[in-house]
Amino acid sequence: MLHQHPQQNRTAQSLDLDGQGLENLDDACLQGNSLLKISLYDNRLRQFPRQILQHADLQVLNISCNQLSELPTEIGLLKQLAMLDCGHNQANQVPAGIRELRELTYLYLSDNAFRDLPVELGRLHKLRYLNATDNQLSEMPAAIMQLGALQELRLYNNQIASLPETFGQLSALRELHLMNNRLVALPEQIAQLSALRVLDVENNAIGQLPTTFGRLVNLTHLNLRTNRLQQLPTSIGQLKALTTLDLRANQLSALPDSLAELTQLQRLDLRWNNFAEMPAVLAPLIAQGCLVHI
């Protein structure tokens, strides 16, 4: 249904047309002063409203939860854009023009049909947050390794089978979410992510952790649930900041003594492994107040 007169929430600098059931956008909605924020979340738009491109000062654009099959090649005209959310659409390609969005800090591409991301994405040197979950990525896009300011990367629910050796270049990364992919290993170079606080690789096929894993000394939350781990490296005892460790549904039958060195650990989940008896190393952890499930 086309709403000829949608219920607008407009100020001098912003336009909010969320949840109006719009299939098209009336030109009159975007006339007037240059807008800084436009939100068209949760409508039925099949085509990107090209009138948006006239708002050269636009800083925030939310066009998520529509039915867009493509993004405009001229998206680069919005050079002041700091946040772009085009998640939950039907697009299969990110236009090369995205390289012009040099002010972009937040980019949401989740739940589309992307099989890769363009090399031009690597020019977004201010990007701090990238979400490309629920797509069809079969490998880590090379452009991501150029995003030196990136602090949070969410790529879960894809088909990624490996991480490149260059992954360690993301020195600012604080959160990495890769659950529900096809990883069989983590590269040694992951130890170079010295700022990493959160690592979630649940539901992959990881058979072992690299010996360098203990260098992730700022890690506080580690989720390794539903993988194929048969043992843990001794270096795991170096993760002194760790507060939560989820090892459910692996193939562990023993634990390294170094685990007792995790004095900040508050929660340890070991259910659905292969322990014949309670590992002795758990006693000091329980004594210090760690909640252990086994």
Predicted feature residues:
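The feature captures the LRR N-terminal capping module
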Residues: 1-226, 230-246, 253, 257, ...
